[in-house]
Every structure is written in C-alpha cells, then in structure tokens.
C-alpha cells in the first residue's frame, strides 16, 4: 500500500482545504514546529481508511477531529496497492449530524457501506486497524533505546509486537481445552451410532446394482427392436388409411365430371360472344335512353298546352285590375282630412291621460299631507317621552355609583391575578409529577437495557478471547519446526497441523466489541442524564410547592364572592351608562326628525294647491274638442276614423299587390313557354339520332345470331372476369384428378414394401409390456442407488468424524501445552526470543545494505544476562557493541530496526510506505556531515516511500524532499518541496 494523494478540510488544524501529493516523494521529512500538525497528516491517512484516530481512541467520535468552529469535515486518500488505484472519501457534518463514506477502485465507485470498509481493506491489504496503526508510524526513539538498553530490549519488543496479551491467550487456552474435550466426546458418540455402516454392505449393494444395470441393458435392446417394428407397423397403417382417403376422393371427382363439362361449354360460348358484348351493351343503353327521351317529350308537350291556357287567362285578369285601380284614386283626397282629425284626437287623448295621472298625483299628495301631519304629531309626543326616560335613567345611575367602589374593585382584581398564578403553578406541579413518573419509568427500562448490553459485551469478550487464544496458539506452532525442543515445556515438537486462523473474524469481533462498548457508554451516559433530570425535577417540584403555599397566604378567603358582587355592580353601572347615552342620542335624533317633519308638512300643502290648478286647465281643452266635432265618446270616434282610413289604404294596396303578382306570373309563364319549346326541339333531334345508331348496331349483331338471338342474351352469355376463375376451377379439377390417380399408384407401390409386417395392435401390446418392465427395473435401480448413496454418505461421515476427532486431539495437545506449561511470563519470553532473532536478522540485512560493511548478531546468552546485540564488520569479522556506533551509524541502525519491525508486523500486506517519528535531538557535527550520504544510501537500498516526522530544522533541511507544515494563527497549511 502506497499513498498517492491526501485531501483534507476541517480536520484538526487543517481548517482550509489542503492537498498533499505523495507521488514525487520517496524518502522525505514532515517538517514543522511542535503543534503545527505534522502527526495530523498520518492521523488523516488513518481516519480516511478506518474512520478512527489512534491518539483519540479506537471508537472516537468524529467531532473530536473536527476543526474548531467548523461544521463540516472532508478527508480523502488516493492510494495504490498491487498495481491498482483506490480512493476512500469520508464526509462529516455536525448539524444535522450526517456522515458518508465513498470507496472507488480504478475510478469506479464500489457498493461498500461505512461499517464494511475495514473488512474490505483487510481483504485487499491484509491489514486490520490495530496492525495498520502499529506499522504506519514507528517510534524512532524506541528503536534507539532498543539498540542501547539491553535490559529494556524485550520489554520494548513485546510492546511493539503486542505480545503483552499472550497471558490472556493462556487463560483462553484453558477454557478452550475444556470446550474441545466436550466436542470430542460428542463426536465419538456420533461415530458409535454409525458402526453398522460398513464397506461390506456397500459391496453387496454395488453387486445388486450391477445385476440390475445388465437386466436393464437387455430390456432396452428388446424395447429398441419392438420400437422399430412398431414404427414400421404405424407407417403401414398410415399408408392404408391414406389410400382409403385417396380412393374416396377419386370417386367424388368422377361424380363431378358432367358438371365440369357444362362449365367447359359455358366458357366456350362466353369466348364467342366476347367481341360483340360492347355492341349489345350499347344497343341496350340506346333503348333505355330512347324510352326516357320519349317519356320526357310527351310530358313536355302536355305542359306546353297547359301553359298556353294559363297565359291567356293571366292577360285577361291584368286588364280588369288596371280598370279598377283607376277608379279608386278619387278616395285618396278624403283620406287627408280624416288623418288631420285623428291627429287632433291623439292630442286630446294625451291630455286625458295626463289628467288621469294628475288625479292620481292629487290623491297621493293629499295622502302625503295627511301622513306628514300625523308624523309631526307623533314625533312631538315621542320627544316628550324621551325627556322623561333620560331623567329616570340618570336617577338610577346615581344610586349604583353610590354602591360601587372602583378602588376596591381594582385591588381585588390584583388579588385575582395571584389566584390565576396559583392555579398555573398547581398545574405545572402536576405536569412535573407526570414527567417525574415518566422519567422514572424510562430510567428503569434503560437500566434493563444496560444490563442486557453488559451481558452481550461479556459474551463478546469471551468469544474474542477464545479466537485470540486459537490465533496465538497457531503463532507459537509457526515458530517451531518438527524435532525442535519446546523452550517452555521441554517436549519435542512433532509438527502437528493446525487449522487456518480466521484473522478477519477476530478483527470483526473486535469491531463488534468496540461498537458494543460504545453502546454501553452511550446507555450509561443516558442513565446518568436521566438521574440528573430526576433530581432536577424533584428540586423544581419542592420549589413550586413552597411558592404555592406563599400564594395561598396572600389570597383572601371570600375573594371570588366579593369580586363577583362588584363585577355585577360594575356591569349594571356600565349598562345604565350605555342606556343613558343611547336615550340621549335617541332624544336628539327625534327632535331633529320633528323639525324635518314640520318642513315636510309645509312643502306638501304648497304642492297640493299647484296640482289642483293644473287639472282645471286640462279639463277645459277636452271639453272644447268634443263640442267642435260633436263627439260623445272619444274611443268610438277614433275607431271610426281609423277604420275609414284603413279601408282606403288597404283597398288600394290590395289592387297594387294583385297587379304586381299578375305581371310577375305572366312573365314567368312566357319565359317557361320559350324554354319548353326549345327543349322539345332538342329532344326530337336526339331521338332521331339514337334510332339511326340502333339500326346500325343491330346489323353488326346479325353475325352471331345462331349463338344469341338478342343483345340481352349476348350480355348474359359473356362471363367477363369470371372466365379466368372458371378456367382455374376446370384446371384444378383436372390436376386434382390426375394427382390423385398418381398418388394412388404410389401408395399401392409403397404398401408392397410392408408385406409380412405384424398387426399394429399386437406389436403395441408387446411394446407396452416391455416398457412396464423397464419402468419397474428403473424404479428398483433408483432405490438401490439411493440406498447406496445414503450408505456412502454415512461412510463418508464416519471418515470425517475420524478426521475431526484426530484433528481435535491435535488441537487439544496444543491447548494442553499452552494452558499447562506456558505459565507466568515464560510464554512471552519464549516468543520474544524468537521474534528478537527474526528482528535482528531482518535489521542486519537492511544495515548491511545501508553501510556496505556492517551487520548485526545476537551474542550467546550467559547466566544472569540477556542476549546482547553486537555490530560485526564483514571485512575483518571484528565484533563491537552498538554503543560504539557514530551518530550517523546509530541513525542508520535505528532505521534498520524500524524497517525490520515494519516488515514483520505487515507480513504479506505489501506495505510500500512507512512513517517514522525521529527521536534524536539536535544533530552533532558528525551527523550533519554524513546526513546527505545516509539519505542517499536509504533511497538506493529501500524500495519504500519513507517519511520521517521531525521538528528539528537543521535535520529537516538536509532532505531534498520535504512536506512543510506551517502554523497560520488558528489553522495550518502544507507545502510539498521536492
């Protein structure tokens, strides 16, 4: 695994977006002052991959790494692994809280949930969170002590490799030993139940199976022969049935031969008359047209005769009307005088209408006058009553004011507010009692959940211990070779095989344990919060009770009755005041109405006198008209005038209308007569032309007189488009007849090939019998196979049980050794000695690459003294202590051991990157001179990306590749130099 690019925003000191490109870097330094955020770069890499940061704990809440004052966080890491590129992005928002994870492979997003990322990383890299955090950042200072302090060497190695948990392994081994013993006994009991399933029984069944298969083979051969014979018989039967059908059809066609002959004759006639059909059709068209024209001619001749009579009558009528019109012109002079009288009469009628309206208006004015007079008298009386009512109301109001005190009412209302406050506090007290009961119930329920979670956590810890025990047992065995002496128990290791260890399962269990621990902490926090809330509620309730007592002391006993009495008086007072204002206003309104009524009465009297004078003048004009024309009733006189005028006008109009209609009718008749005469002339010409054409066509038809005697018969004999259909039917008949005769001969010839074939029914019966036998044999064969398969499974299970029991006994031997012999710290010492040798050997390879002359060896242990590390010069084989190394050599030696531990921890994880926390202080003169040479040696001999975290400027400046972290107030920025 090699980082390619890191993007951060809102992460610890990196508030603003920062991008670190690792691709041009190989051996570099992360440079910056203390607190600038150097280690935060490695924290960001770890957080991007696993969502956790080691220094804040494995199950850290993201809010601890969120930059101060920021609401959102983003960390993204691009890395390569085994030739493929990956990207992991993590997003977090504080409110509303939300977190997301996205994973990409070669630019394509993978469907991986947040809780599946660590499992996916372990699958592709072989590194779980715990291992990754040990190998990503190595404490250089520890390796410096590792070299120089032999007494602390094993302790440091145990800490680096995580061997401090091996005592837990021993305890788990003891528990697992008991569990495995129980499992072995159960397997032995199951093995005992399978004792009757033997190989001999299997051989008997296999022999039976073989016999059945041979019998089946013979039956199948017989079946195949019968099937072939049955096929021949079915073919013969099919041919015989087909021959019968062909013979039947031939007879049917022979019966149709006479009808087909008639069709041939009909077709021949049609072909003979075909050239004359257009002539015959034209003759028929001429006959039809002549008939129509002659009918039309007769009709028009009759119409022309009638039309001539009508014209003569119309001329006579016109002459009579002209004479009558001349005579009636004298009456028009008298009409003018009549119209003058009628106009005068209309004027008199209008005057009479006006008189009628004036009479109605007079009555209305008289009524209005009486109403105005009555209204004035009523209002005068009501004004007097209003004055009396105002005086009575004022007297009542004065009496109420004497009983009601505004100051007392205000004081009591203030006390009433205290009563409302008392009721509010009593209600609040009741609500808090309900809240207390609810919280107490929730606390009890959450307590039960807490106990359940604690039990689940204990079960997870037990299972995790058992898995780790198995894992470490496997690790112990991996360091021993067959024939080695166990340094703990002294026994000989015989190379007993162990099953593969599911490291991924351990990682998942640890993750589940961490989640359960987090859940337990959250529940515990909730319980404490509930307890705080309960105590707080109790304090608030006590305070409320005291306040209630104080309020009760301040409120008088009969407060409500006293307020009620005063409230009634106040309401009565307000009502009387409202009435008084109302009465006063009403009195003012009535006085105004009285004045208006008096003015209205005077106006009505004046209008009444004027109206009477106008009526007298109009009546005089009507009387003068009647005397002039001696008229008794105006309606009768008007009617006689109108009748006389209407008679004169209508008579003259009638004469003119008749004249107009007759002239129009005469013109129409004349026009129609001309048209009829022209049409008759054209009809005569058409009839003559058609008769000539008919004679010519009949002469042409004389050539086929022996076939058809008339044009109609020619048309009927001609088939037209039906000729082709008739010809096709005749041809189909002839072809079918010949085809059936040929087919009959072919079938008769084929049937000769099937002579000697048995009857179909006999063969079918024999075939069905053989098939039944085959089915029975197949059924029997299946039963034997199933029995044999079951026996095979049982025998296989016996073998599996033998193998499982054997493997369990091997495991039991290992756990027995661990639980009984690896006591105290002997196991840790033993493993640490093995690992020390491996670390020294691996570091020696690196040191020789860096120096070209030196390597490490472990001295032999002496009584009371641990093995020590010495430096050996390859050219002279001279040995010297590591304390004799110069500053630059010590730096290279520490790096060698750092790389060695990283290799051992990462195993097959292909870790292509490493970060080292340098632990030297300021460089001495020798180191300053040699640092460039050292860095070049590391670049040349290590195929890894290596970063050293340093806060010492003179050390960092020696690197050509640098990541510089600079503090900018409350945030930091990063620059990459290469």
Swiss-Prot record:
Zn(2+) binds at residues 486, 489. Its cofactor is Zn(2+). Binds 1 zinc ion per homodimer. NCBIfam families: sbcc. Residues 160-421, 440-478, 510-542, 578-826 form a coiled coil. The two conserved Cys that bind zinc constitute the zinc-hook, which separates the large intramolecular coiled coil regions. The 2 Cys residues coordinate one molecule of zinc with the help of the 2 Cys residues of the zinc-hook of another Rad50 molecule, thereby forming a V-shaped homodimer. Residues 440-542 form the Zinc-hook domain. This is Probable DNA double-strand break repair Rad50 ATPase. InterPro entries: P-loop_NTPase (IPR027417), Rad50/SbcC_AAA (IPR038729), SbcC_gammaproteobac_type (IPR004592), Zn_hook_RAD50 (IPR013134). It holds the Pfam family SbcC_Walker_B. Homodimer. Forms a complex with Mre11. One of its GO terms (molecular function) is ATP hydrolysis activity. The keyword Coiled coil applies. ATP binds at residues 32-39. The gene is rad50.
């Amino acid at each position: 695994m090699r980082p390619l690019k890191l993007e951060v925003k809102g992460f610890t000191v990196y508030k603003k977006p920062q991008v670190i490109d690792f691709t041009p870097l190989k051996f570099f330094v992360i440079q910056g002052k203390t607190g600038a955020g150097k280690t935060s770069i490695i924290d960001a890499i770890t957080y991007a991959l696993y969502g956790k940061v080691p220094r804040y704990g494995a199950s850290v809440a993201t809010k601890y790494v969120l930059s101060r004052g920021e609401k959102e966080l983003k960390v993204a890491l691009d890395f390569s692994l085994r030739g493929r590129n990956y990207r992991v992005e993590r997003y977090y928002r504080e409110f509303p809280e939300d977190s997301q994870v996205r994973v990409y492979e070669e630019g394509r997003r993978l469907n991986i949930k947040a809780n599946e990322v660590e499992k996916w990383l372990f699958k592709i890299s072989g590194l779980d969170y715990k291992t990754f955090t040990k190998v990503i950042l190595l404490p250089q200072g520890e390796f410096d002590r590792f070299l120089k302090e032999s007494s602390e060497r094993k302790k440091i190695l145990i800490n680096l490799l995580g061997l401090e948990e091996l005592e837990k392994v021993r305890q788990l081994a003891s528990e697992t030993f008991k569990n495995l013993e129980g499992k072995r006994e159960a397997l032995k009991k199951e093995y005992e139940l399978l004792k009757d399933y033997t190989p001999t029984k299997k051989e008997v069944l296999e022999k039976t199976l073989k016999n059945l298969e041979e019998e089946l083979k013979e039956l199948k051969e017989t079946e195949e022969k019968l099937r072939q014979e049955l096929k021949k018989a079915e073919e013969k039967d099919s041919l015989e049935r087909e021959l019968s059908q062909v013979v039947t059809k031939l007879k049917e066609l022979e019966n149709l031969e006479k009808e087909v002959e008639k069709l041939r004759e009909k077709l021949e006639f049609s072909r003979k008359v075909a050239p004359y059909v257009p002539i015959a059709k034209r003759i028929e068209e001429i006959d039809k047209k002549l008939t129509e024209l002659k009918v039309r001619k007769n009709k028009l001749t009759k119409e022309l005769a009638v039309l001539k009579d009508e014209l003569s009558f119309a001329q006579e009528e016109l002459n009579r009307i002209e004479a009558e019109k001349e005579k009636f012109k004298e009456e028009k002079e008298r009409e003018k005088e009549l119209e003058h009288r009628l106009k005068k009469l209309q004027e008199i009628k209008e005057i009479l209408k006006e008189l009628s309206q004036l009479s109605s208006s007079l009555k209305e004015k008289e009524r209005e006058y009486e109403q105005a007079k009555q209204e004035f008298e009523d209002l005068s009386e009501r004004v007097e009553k209003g004055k009396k009512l105002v005086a009575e109301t004022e007297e009542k109001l004065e009496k109420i004011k004497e009983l009601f005190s505004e100051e007392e009412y205000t004081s009591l209302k203030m006390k009433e507010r205290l009563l409302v406050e008392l009721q509010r506090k009593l209600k609040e007290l009741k609500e808090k009692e309900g809240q207390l009961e609810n919280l107490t119930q929730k606390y009890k329920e959450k307590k039960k959940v807490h106990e359940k979670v604690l039990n689940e956590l204990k079960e997870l810890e037990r299972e995790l211990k058992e898995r780790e025990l198995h894992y470490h047992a496997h690790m112990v065995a991996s360091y021993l070779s067959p024939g080695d002496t166990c340094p703990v128990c002294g026994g000989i290791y015989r190379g007993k095989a162990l099953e593969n260890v599911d490291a991924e399962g351990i990682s998942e269990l640890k993750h589940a344990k961490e989640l359960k621990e987090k859940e337990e902490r959250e529940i515990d926090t909730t319980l404490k919060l509930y307890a705080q809330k309960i105590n707080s509620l109790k304090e608030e309730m006590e305070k409320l009770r005291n306040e209630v007592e104080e309020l009760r002391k301040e409120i008088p006993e009969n407060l409500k009755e006293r307020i009620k009495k005063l409230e009634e008086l106040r309401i009565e007072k307000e009502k009387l005041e409202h009435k008084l204002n109302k009465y006063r206003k009403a009195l003012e309104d009535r006085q105004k109405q009285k004045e208006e009524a008096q003015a209205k009465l005077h106006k009505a009297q004046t209008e009444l006198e004027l109206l009477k004078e106008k009526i007298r003048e109009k009546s005089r004009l009507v009387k003068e008209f009647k005397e002039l024309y001696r008229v008794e009733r105006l309606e009768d006189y008007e009617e006689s005038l109108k009748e006389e005028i209407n008679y004169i006008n209508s008579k003259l109009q009638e004469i003119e209308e008749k004249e107009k209609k007759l002239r129009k009718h005469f013109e129409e008749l004349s026009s129609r007569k001309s048209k009829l005469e022209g049409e008759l002339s054209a009809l005569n010409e058409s009839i003559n032309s058609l008769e000539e054409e008919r004679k010519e066509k009949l002469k042409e038809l004389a050539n086929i007189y022996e076939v058809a005697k008339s044009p109609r018969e020619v048309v009927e004999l001609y088939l037209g488009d039906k000729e082709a259909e008739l010809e096709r039917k005749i041809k189909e008949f002839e072809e079918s007849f010949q085809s059936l005769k040929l087919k009959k001969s072919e079938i008769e010839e084929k049937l000769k090939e099937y002579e000697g074939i048995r009857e179909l029914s006999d063969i079918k019966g024999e075939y069905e019998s053989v098939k039944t036998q085959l089915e029975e044999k197949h059924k029997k064969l299946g039963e034997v196979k199933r029995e044999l398969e079951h026996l095979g499974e049982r025998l296989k299970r016996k073998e599996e049980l033998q193998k499982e029991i054997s493997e369990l006994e091997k495991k039991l031997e290992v756990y027995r050794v661990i639980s009984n012999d690896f006591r105290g710290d002997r196991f840790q010492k033993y493993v640490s000695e093995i690992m020390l040798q491996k670390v020294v050997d691996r570091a020696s390879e690196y040191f020789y690459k860096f120096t070209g002359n030196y390597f490490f060896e472990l001295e032999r242990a002496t009584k009371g003294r641990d093995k020590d590390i010495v430096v050996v010069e390859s050219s002279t084989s001279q040995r010297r202590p590591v304390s004799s190394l110069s500053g630059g050599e010590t730096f290279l030696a520490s790096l060698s051991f750092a790389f060695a531990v990283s290799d051992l921890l990462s195993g097959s994880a292909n870790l292509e990157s490493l970060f080292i926390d340098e632990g030297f202080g300021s460089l001495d003169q020798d180191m300053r001179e040699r640092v460039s040479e050292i860095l070049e040696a590391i670049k040349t001999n290590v195929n890894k990306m290596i970063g050293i975290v340093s806060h010492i400027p003179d050390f960092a400046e020696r690197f050509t590749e640098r990541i510089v972290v600079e503090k900018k107030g409350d945030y930091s920025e990063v620059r990459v130099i290469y």
